[in-house]
Regions:
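Glycine-rich phosphate/diphosphate-binding loop of Rossmann-like nucleotide-binding domains
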Residues: 37-51, 133-231, 235, 240, ...
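Short beta-strand segments enriched in small/hydrophobic residues
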Residues: 29-39
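Short, well-structured alpha-helical segments in soluble
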Residues: 74-86
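Rossmann-fold NAD(P)-binding glycine/threonine-rich loop
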Residues: 106-124, 236-291
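C-terminal helix-to-coil terminal segments
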Residues: 2-4, 275-318
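Positively charged, low-complexity intrinsically disordered leader regions
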Residues: 1-28
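Anion-binding alpha/beta catalytic cores of soluble intermediary-metabolism enzymes, centered on
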Residues: 93-162
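Short beta-strand elements in bilobed, periplasmic/extracellular small-molecule ligand-binding domains
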Residues: 54-68, 191-193
């Protein structure tokens, strides 16, 4: 079987269109403030990409660069300053933070209404109750892609009875694995979460109608791990060296093998990451509305996008 590509661009484009319209409705230009306290090149690149994404939809972006050896107090002071600044709609703390700094304490310090990364305990608690208003962006991206795949998802328990989709999430991080599982549980999926302690990964993954992989290990999931016809959502973004000494980006799923078995599969790049960026923009709009800006209600990302992958195309393997 050759799988259909479940591409992120059609979903992301629709979200960006909605965000542009929302910016016009709000009555003031939202602003994202990013805090960078590292010289990590990946974090610097991510900050630049955030700025570019904001610019595309009319959201202001400002980068607050702190020293790579900034102290806990230095970063907490900056967070407090941005919390109190009414011109700042949204705050994101880029990782990693300096050695010896308590990242979780910093996440707790961000005003929950400005926490567009969805890492403050208040917003994580919202995920437990099924809210996507300021849920972690990648978890929202996973849900959007699963919805776009057309697998059965439900909001009504009577309709869901005995019909829930079998989902396996590989990885239990606080910003991807756990919240993805919770959001899918809220759609009456039967969710199994696997992690480093799982004794027989294959025994679990081959039962999955939807397989979500988010561990940061290139090629961990192979064709043998996948149920024929399953939907595979590959969250991993890993840079690996090629035989010619260069590098390329790959996921956590061994793509060529998986595409022969799966029914639908997200590409890397071009899948989850693309939608995650759009969800950050969506969260900025939600933050603006939570802070009392014009236009009530959270922005709805495009759910139920059809019974097949939007813009999906078959993967022809040689």
């Amino acid at each position: 079987m050759s799988a259909t590509l479940l591409e992120g661009a059609p979903i992301a484009d629709k979200i960006k269109e909605d965000v542009k319209a929302a910016v016009a409705e709000i009555g003031r230009v939202p602003k994202l403030a990013a805090i960078l306290a590292t010289d990590n090149k990946g974090a610097e690149f991510y900050a630049k990409s955030q700025g570019k994404a904001c610019e595309e939809v009319g959201i202001e972006f400002e980068l607050h660069q702190l020293a790579a050896d900034a102290s806990q107090a230095d970063i907490e002071t900056k967070i407090a300053e941005l919390n109190d600044n009414v011109a700042v709609t949204a705050i994101i703390l880029l990782m990693p933070v300096p050695a010896g700094v308590d990242g979780r304490a910093l996440q707790r310090a961000i005003d929950p209404k400005k926490d567009v990364d969805g890492v403050n305990p208040v917003n994580i608690g919202g995920v437990v109750q099924g809210s996507t208003t300021l849920a972690p962006c990648t978890a929202q991206a996973v849900l959007a892609l699963v919805e776009a795949s057309g697998v059965p998802l439900f909001t009504d328990p009577k309709e869901a009875q005995g019909k829930g989709t079998e989902v396996v999430v590989v990885g239990h991080s606080e910003i991807v694995g756990k919240p993805s599982g919770l959001l899918l549980l809220d759609k009456f999926c039967t969710v199994t979460v696997c992690h480093i302690g799982t004794q027989d990964l294959k025994a679990h993954t081959t039962k999955a109608d939807v397989l979500v992989v988010a561990v940061g290990v290139p090629g961990l999931v192979k064709g043998e791990h996948i149920k024929p016809g399953a939907t595979v959502v590959d969250v991993g973004i890993n840079r690996v060296k090629t035989d010619d000494g260069k590098s390329r980006i790959v996921g956590d799923v061994l793509f060529d093998e998986a595409a022969e078995i799966a029914g639908q599969i997200t590409p890397v790049p071009g899948g989850v990451g693309t939608v995650t960026t759009a969800m950050l923009l969506k969260n900025i709009i939600d933050a603006a509305r939570l802070q009392g800006h014009r236009s009530p209600g959270p922005l709805k990302f495009p759910g139920n996008l059809g019974q097949s992958a939007p813009g999906g195309r078959r993967v022809k393997l040689q």
